C-alpha cells in the first residue's frame, strides 16, 4: 500500500527528507503505469487567510509535482491543485491537528 500524504512544516512547502520515499514510490508507480494520472492536492491548516492558504497549498502541491518530474514522471500524468484550508483532515486546533492538515495528498484518476 502506498502512503498518500506528504506532510510539511508550518508555513513551508519544502518536502522533508522523511517523505521523499513516499514521493519516490508514487513516481515509480506512475512511470510503470503511464495510463494513470495523479492529482497532487495541497492542503494547509486553518491558520491564516483563505488566499494565503490557497497559495501555500499550491506551492506544496507544486513541490511534490516537481520532485516527481525530476524522478521521470511525464508532465501529462500530473496535476497540482490547492484546497488551502477547505479539506481539513483534523478539525481541532491543537499542534497535532494542525500538523495533520499541513499536507499534500496524491489522488489517482478514477478515485
PLM-predicted stretches and their roles:
Residues 90-94:
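Short beta-alpha junctions and helix-cap segments that line functional grooves
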Residues 19, 53-61, 99:
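Short, conserved glycine- and acidic-residue-centered signature motifs
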Residues 31-33, 97-100:
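Extracellular/periplasmic catalytic domains that process cell-envelope and extracellular macromolecules
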Residues 72, 95-98:
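Short, exposed beta-strand-loop hairpins at the edges of beta-sheets
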Residues 1-2:
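Short, small-residue-biased leader/transition segments that mark boundaries at the very start
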Residues 9-15:
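Second-shell loop/turn segments in exported
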Residues 34-43, 58-89, 102-111:
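A non-catalytic structural micro-motif
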Amino acid at each position: 500500500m502506498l502512503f498518500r500524504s506528504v506532510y510539511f512544516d508550518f508555513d513551508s512547502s519544502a518536502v522533508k527528507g522523511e517523505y521523499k520515499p513516499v514521493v519516490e514510490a508514487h513516481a515509480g508507480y506512475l512511470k510503470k503505469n503511464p495510463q494513470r494520472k495523479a492529482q497532487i492536492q495541497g492542503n494547509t491548516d486553518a491558520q491564516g487567510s483563505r488566499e494565503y492558504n490557497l497559495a501555500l497549498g499550491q506551492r506544496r502541491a507544486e513541490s511534490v509535482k516537481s520532485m516527481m518530474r525530476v524522478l521521470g514522471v511525464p508532465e501529462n500524468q500530473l496535476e497540482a491543485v490547492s484546497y488551502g484550508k477547505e479539506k481539513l483532515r483534523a478539525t481541532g486546533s491543537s499542534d497535532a491537528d494542525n500538523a495533520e492538515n499541513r499536507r499534500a495528498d496524491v489522488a489517482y484518476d478514477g478515485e
